[in-house]
Each structure stands twice: as structure tokens, then as C-alpha cells.
Amino acid sequence: SSGTSEQFGKFLQGANAGPDASLWPKTASGTFSSMTPVPLSNYFNFQGASGSALLAAGVKSKIGAIGYAESAWFTSNKLGTALVQNWAKEFVAPTAAATSAFLGGGTIEANGSVTTPYQKAIPGGYPIGTASYGLVYPEAAKKDAEKQKIVAAWHTYLLDKCATKFPELGYIQITGALYDKAKAQIAKIK
């Protein structure tokens, strides 16, 4: 099962909601072929791949191949990327700034997750962006306090330092309300 496939499926379904819902009626799934409206092999020479590394290698090795993965895999394999039309009617590349614009237009939920607005016109927003999340034990789980300090420090590093160390891989430093919410969530790790 793939989180990337599930997120891509959510985009395909969300972007086609409303009057065009029949274009992508199935619910998102971790397996791309199980969420497509029709069996892909009936229309295309379809070859799935498990994991972004295998997918990127497969796309690179086949003339005319297309695929979807995190932008870092396409960058590191020197593969081209497609511009995707957003609801502001712009064709946008998958850049860190465009992903940040899209996620910044989302709703920050109480648990820190972001609900993405596929049908919201966000100028400059790349509409297939997604956030990464860290799952940790809540204070109520009464885990070892010293280990929890390490977990909190790791998440602080990811939030404050990691993105600025690896911008060439497409990581972005979050800011504003989303950053504030992430810091508040990290403060709960005890």
C-alpha cells in the first residue's frame, strides 16, 4: 500500500468532484490500479511499481513512460515533470513554493493534519502537494519521559532544520499557522 498513491487518488477524486464526479468516482486507495474508474490494462500498457525508487527507475528506463512520485525522485533521476492545472486555471510546476502555496490554502485540523482544498482557486498553488506527518504517542500513553524528549527533539529537527538542509530535494520550510500548529503538537510529546 502506498501513501503516495492514496494522496494522488485523493487529488484525482477531489479535483473531479461536483459536476465532473463521474470522471473519478472511486475512493482513494493505497493501490493505484484498484482506485481507477476502469481497468487500466484495457486501455494502456500499464505497469505498476512498488515504491517511489522503483517507479522513478521504471519511468526513466521506458521511452514515453509517465508516473507519479515525490518530486525528489524525479529531480534525483533527472526526469521531467508535468505542469498541472489548478482551480485558478494556472498550469503549475511541482515546486516547493507552489506546494507551500497550495498547503497554505488548506484547513489546519485540531490534530495538526491539513485538509487540502482541491477545488479552491489558490494562485500559484500546485494542487497535488501533500504534507508529511510524524505519528507519536500522546502524553496519556505514559511512555518513558527521556525517550519522549528524544522523539520531540527529532521532530523539532525535522520541522526547523531538515527542510533548509535539503532544498534541492524539494523539501520546504513550513511557516505561519501550520508551523505554529506543528510546534504546539511537538510540545505535547512528553
What are these regions (language model features)?
Residues 1-190:
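Flexible loop/hinge segments at secondary-structure junctions
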